[in-house]
Amino acid sequence: MGGVWVGCAVRALVVWDERSSEAQRVAERVRRGLAPYADCEVCAVGRCGRIDADVVVAVGGDGTILKTAHLLAGVEVPVVGVNVGRLGFLTEFSADEFLQSLPDVLTAKPSRRMMLDVSHQDASWCAVNEGMLVRVGPPRIAHINLFVNDRFVTTYAGDGVVVATPTGSTAYSLSAGGPIVVPQVKALLVTPLNPHTLTNRPLVLPKAAVVRLEPADGRTEIALSVDGQVDVAVKQGESVTIRASQHAFLLVERQDFFVTLKTKLTWGGLPRYGKR
C-alpha cells in the first residue's frame, strides 16, 4: 500500500459542515486523534479558502465531501469522509472507525475518482458527481439539445439532463433511472430527467467524449447545477460543455464498492418472501 501522507511534517485539514453542531464536535474529536500524526487545522467548510494541506478529513455528509472537492478545484489531495449525515455514501467512516483505524488510514492508497470539467460562458468548475441542466420556475417541459463531439444527437423533452461520472451514478442520475457504474470505469453517463417520451434512455459514453448541452428554445427557464454547489441560469443561445477532467478526486475508501451499495442503498437484496 503506497502511503502518501506518512511522515512527521504532514499537514492535515479537518473541515466540517457548519450547519451541524454534531459535525463541529466530531471535527474537534478528529483533530485530537490526528494530533500525534500531523499538524492539524480545523475549519468550517463554508468558510475555508484555498486548501493547502496533505490530507483533508471532511466531517459531515456527502454534501460536505462535494463542497470540499469544489474547494480543492482539481488539486489532487486525499480526502477522508467521516459521516455525521444521513446517508454518507462518500463519507464512509464513522468517527469511531476513523479513529480506531488511523494507522491504516494513514497508509491507505486513495481511490482515483474521475471528475468532470464543466464550462459555461467564461466560467468553469470541477464536478465529482454531475453537471446538469434542469428546468426552473413554472412546470413547463424543457427542450435541451445534446451534442457529442460536436455532433447533434437528440433533443430531450422533460425536466432536464444529467451528465454524471461513475461516482455520480449512485447520486442524482440513479434517482432518474441511470445505471450504476463502478468507480473504476472511465465513462460519462447521460441521463434524461423525466423525459416526455417512452424511447429516451440513458447513454454511456467513453471518457474521451465531449458533451455539449444547450436550450433548444427560450420558453422555459433553465439552470446549470454542478454537484449541487453551483446554480447558474443558461439562456437560449448559450451552451454548457462537459468533459472528463485531467484531474482526479482522491477518496480514501473504507470498504468495497459493492458492500457500500448493499449497506447504504440496500442494493441487490432478495425480496422478502412470505412463508409457504
Regions found by a protein language model. Name each.
Residues 57, 83, 131, 228:
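A residue-level signal for conserved active-site and pocket-lining positions in enzyme catalytic cores
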Residues 125, 133, 138, 149-152, ...:
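ATP/nucleoside-binding phosphotransfer catalytic cores, i.e., glycine-rich phosphate-binding loops
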Residues 63-69, 170-175:
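Short glycine/serine/threonine-rich phosphate/pyrophosphate-binding segments
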Residues 87-160:
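Catalytic core of DAGKc-family lipid kinases
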Residues 16, 60, 83, 215:
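Short beta-strand/turn micro-motifs composed of small residues
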Residues 155-159, 163-199:
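Gly/Ser/Thr-rich active-site loops/lids in small-molecule metabolic enzymes
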